């Protein structure tokens, strides 16, 4: 089989024009191989004159009057000696059980292949064509036609005799005939006719276009595409005819069917054969010697084209020039094209050669892609059609692609394709790794090595890591981060890194990688030391992930120096593992760090670190004065005397004022504001906060000889102190800045207060009236008294069991009920009775509203 394929490929290479192959990269549509075996021996001694194709076998006629039955591979299965001269045509029925043969000496034989019984006749003229009814074996009246100088129809009657009918004559020799269903198509010197055997009517006559061509040299090619579509090729003309049913209303004396030419076009070369291929046409061309379209040495090579018919033309899909044996000696009439409808096989028959053309399958497509070095497309095609390919293996194609990429020097792509191609084959993986090592490209393949459930031997990974350690520290660090620690011997790699650190002890990349290796090996203390030494950002993640708090108790200062915020957050979040006292003890010699820790602790919880609040006063004063006053305001545990002492030593006026006021020495605090800050606004604000008349007096006394202070007081005192007190104490003749504006503001504020009071009074009166009316409406409503109610004094039912007797009940607005005799005597105000229960809480709502008597 491999020999046949190689022969086919060789023929295909021979049959494709080399100049066109250089210009185009289009993949051929068909592949070719010679029909060999018994055919080769036959054609060495004889020459092929005709051939008919059946799905099961082939029938070959020769110039020496012999007919050979062949299998699909060309082996001879049967041989018939029919005549001593050329066999003109062979016809088979659909079942392949009967054959019809005609020869140049006028012999016609129709017989069964499994029995020689049949029709045997000698005519006095050459018989050019013969055609059996497609259902010859199954029909009772066996029918066939022969054509010489006239077309004769033979059918066997009920007496088992052959009846002859002339279908056509008088227009020269019949050169071609094709029978499909009930339709017989034939060609003579004038044109093509179609006869309906069912209605016994000739339904069309398609005239031949180029009458200058000799019919015997350029015979007509007929081919049925289906039961109603006939393809006619004659000379350089192609016509596609559709047989259609005629409308019964238009028949009159016309046949029941008619023919419509649906497509007609001219070709570049002479047509030797036609065959359908789906909705396209396969055409066999004879190229005349005087054609200017081809090179001199290829002028008479036949061509096999695939064309797409259009209504008024055609489009060429593919074109192959075929090198058949002795093609230089052949004429147009020497070529024939036969096809097998079942398998889309096309047979090109010439006197000394038979070539089989077939559609290319997926294997052929991949062959072509590999030949053109389109390995990626070949790999993709193989993956998509892996169930249908027979000669190719996806992995082998992938390996060829990888080899091609390596040869090109595209190592990165080659390494990337290894993942897809090598898959789970660990032996192939190891071979590729060693190949990449040989060419010095381990770096390219390293990132694609298996690292999941399927793994290579640890030695492979270690080899790559050692190679990176020699040439690329960053690449080595990347692999250590990306590869799981189980892939290689961790201790061996640690030892190798330590050897390199002896040469370069400060290399941060190697140190970081060593810390990661220690982490994989669960030696977290060593990893932590390296991270702290390098101030690496992952140190906190390492501590949290592996719970290394016991290892950092003596390294708190280092952590704080690296990142105060992260360190403090971590320490505060894990107080159960590192106590607050331990942290304070470690930071006692670094007060600035201690302040950061205690400050965040205070922000989280004002009471948790209360025993350190006294120490925090000096820390705030030293390192963070802006937060000292908020601390003093919020802390309930700092000693005020100590705080006052520190603030006075450092002359922190605002903090001292706050402490004095908190300790009750408001006058001293106000004095400091006026004397040391000289800020009347703050003094006024302080006096407002304390709301102490004596402080206001002190403030006025201190400000009375200071015009700017008087202005500030006039602008702000109106709502707290009567401005007249201040105005009366102003000395006559004292010049006060913006006095008029201040007085206007005082009057405006006074008017505003009066308006507010009046407005409030109106609202109060309106609300009081509304509430009084609502209460009056409520009190006017009746109160339900029934057997379920009880006296709040004696706790017996409020209504007597015998309602016919006289009784008295008192019901209050509070809904408490009493028997009249159970109430105490009225109060000091005659006529007003109070509820005993509610009068202890308030007066008024419990006044009696209803007295029931009966």
UniProtKB/Swiss-Prot annotation:
Start-end of Acidic residues biased regions: 14-26
GO MF, one annotated term: zinc ion binding
Biased amino acid composition, Basic and acidic residues: 1-13
Zinc finger residue ranges, RING-type: 791-839
Keyword RNA-binding belongs to the record: no
Membrane topology summary: Peripheral membrane protein
Stored SUPFAM superfamilies: TPR-like (SSF48452), WD40 repeat-like (SSF50978)
Primary localization class, coarse: membrane
GO biological process annotation, one example: protein targeting to vacuole
Recorded superkingdom: Eukaryota
A Pfam family this chain is assigned to: zf-RING_Vps41
Subunit architecture: Core component of at least two putative endosomal tethering complexes, the homotypic fusion and vacuole protein sorting (HOPS) complex and the class C core vacuole/endosome tethering (CORVET) complex.
Protein role: Plays a role in vesicle-mediated protein trafficking to lysosomal compartments including the endocytic membrane transport and autophagic pathways. Believed to act as a core component of the putative HOPS and CORVET endosomal tethering complexes.
Protein name in the entry: Vacuolar protein sorting-associated protein 41 homolog
Gene (name only): vps41
């Amino acid at each position: 089989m491999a020999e046949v394929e190689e022969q086919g490929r060789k023929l295909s290479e021979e049959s494709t024009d080399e100049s066109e192959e250089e210009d185009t990269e289009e993949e051929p549509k068909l592949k070719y191989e010679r029909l060999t075996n018994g055919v080769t021996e036959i054609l060495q001694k004889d020459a092929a004159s005709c051939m008919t194709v059946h799905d099961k076998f082939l029938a070959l006629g020769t110039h020496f009057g012999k007919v050979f039955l062949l299998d699909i591979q060309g082996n001879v299965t049967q041989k018939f000696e029919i005549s001593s001269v050329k066999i003109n045509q062979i016809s088979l029925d659909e079942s392949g059980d009967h054959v019809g043969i005609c020869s140049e000496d006028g012999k016609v034989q129709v017989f069964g292949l499994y029995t020689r019984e049949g029709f045997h006749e000698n005519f006095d003229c050459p018989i050019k064509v013969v055609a059996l009814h497609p259902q010859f074996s199954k029909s009772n009246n066996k029918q066939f036609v022969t054509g010489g100088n006239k077309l004769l129809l033979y059918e066997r009657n009920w007496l088992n005799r052959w009846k002859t009918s002339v279908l056509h004559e008088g227009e020269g020799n019949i050169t071609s005939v094709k029978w499909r269903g009930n339709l017989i198509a034939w060609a003579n010197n004038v044109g093509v006719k179609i006869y309906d055997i069912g209605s016994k009517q000739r339904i069309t006559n398609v005239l031949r276009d180029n009458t200058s061509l000799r019919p015997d040299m350029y015979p007509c090619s007929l081919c049925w595409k289906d039961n109603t579509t006939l393809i006619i090729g004659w000379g350089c003309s192609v016509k596609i005819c559709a047989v259609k049913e005629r409308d019964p209303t238009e028949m009159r004396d016309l046949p029941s069917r008619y023919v419509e030419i649906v497509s007609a076009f001219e070709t570049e070369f002479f047509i030797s054969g036609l065959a359908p291929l789906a909705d396209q046409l396969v055409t066999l061309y004879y190229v005349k010697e005087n054609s200017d379209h081809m090179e001199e040495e290829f002028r008479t090579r036949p061509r096999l084209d695939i064309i797409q018919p259009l209504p008024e033309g055609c489009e060429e899909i593919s074109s192959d020039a075929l090198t058949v044996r002795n093609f230089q000696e052949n004429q147009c009439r020497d070529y024939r094209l036969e096809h097998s409808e079942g398998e889309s096989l096309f047979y090109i028959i010439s006197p000394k050669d038979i070539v089989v053309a077939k559609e290319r399958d997926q294997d052929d497509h991949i062959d072509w892609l590999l030949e053109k070095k389109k390995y990626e497309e070949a790999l993709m095609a193989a993956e998509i059609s892996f169930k249908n390919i027979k000669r190719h293996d996806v992995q082998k194609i992938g390996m060829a692609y990888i080899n091609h990429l390596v040869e090109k020097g595209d190592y990165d792509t080659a390494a990337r394709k290894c993942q897809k191609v090598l898959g789970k084959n660990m032996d192939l993986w190891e071979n590729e790794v060693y190949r990449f090592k040989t060419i010095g490209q381990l770096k390219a393949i390293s990132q694609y090595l298996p690292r999941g459930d399927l793994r290579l031997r640890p030695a492979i990974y270690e080899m790559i890591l050692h190679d990176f350690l020699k040439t690329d520290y960053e690449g080595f660090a990347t692999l250590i981060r990306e590869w799981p620690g189980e892939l290689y011997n961790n201790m061996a790699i640690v030892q190798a890194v330590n050897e390199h650190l002896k040469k370069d002890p400060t290399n941060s990349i190697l140190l970081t990688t060593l810390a990661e290796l220690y982490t994989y090996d669960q030696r977290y203390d060593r990893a932590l030391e390296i991270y702290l030494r390098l101030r690496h950002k992952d140190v906190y993640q390492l501590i949290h992930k592996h719970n290394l708090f016991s290892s950092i108790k003596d390294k708190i200062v280092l952590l704080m120096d690296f990142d105060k915020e992260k360190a403090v957050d971590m320490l505060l979040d894990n107080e159960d593992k590192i106590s607050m006292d331990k942290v304070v003890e470690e930071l006692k010699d670094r007060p600035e760090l201690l302040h950061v820790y205690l400050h965040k602790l205070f922000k989280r919880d004002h009471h948790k670190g209360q025993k350190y609040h006294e120490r925090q006063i000096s820390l705030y004063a030293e390192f963070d004065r802006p937060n000292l006053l908020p601390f003093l305001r919020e802390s309930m545990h700092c000693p005020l005397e100590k705080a006052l002492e520190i603030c006075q030593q450092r002359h922190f006026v605002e903090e001292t004022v706050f402490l004095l006021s908190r300790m009750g020495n408001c006058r001293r605090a106000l004095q400091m504001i006026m004397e040391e800050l000289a800020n009347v606004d703050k003094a006024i604000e302080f006096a407002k906060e304390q709301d102490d008349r004596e402080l206001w007096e002190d403030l006025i006394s201190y400000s009375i000889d200071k015009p700017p202070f008087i202005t500030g007081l006039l602008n702000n005192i109106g709502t707290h102190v009567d401005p007249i007190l201040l105005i009366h104490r102003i000395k006559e003749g004292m010049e006060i800045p913006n006095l008029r504006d201040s007085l206007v503001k005082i009057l405006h504020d006074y008017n505003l207060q009066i308006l507010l009071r009046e407005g409030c009074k109106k609202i109060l009166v309106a609300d009081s009236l509304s509430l009084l009316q609502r209460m009056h409406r409520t009190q006017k409503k009746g109160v339900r008294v029934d057997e379920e109610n009880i006296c709040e004094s004696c706790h017996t039912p409020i209504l007597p069991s015998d309602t016919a007797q006289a009784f008295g009940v008192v019901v209050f607005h509070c809904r408490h009920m009493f028997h009249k005799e159970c109430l105490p005597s009225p109060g000091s105000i005659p006529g007003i009775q109070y509820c005993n229960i509610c009068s202890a809480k308030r007066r008024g709502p419990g006044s009696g509203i209803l007295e029931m008597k009966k």
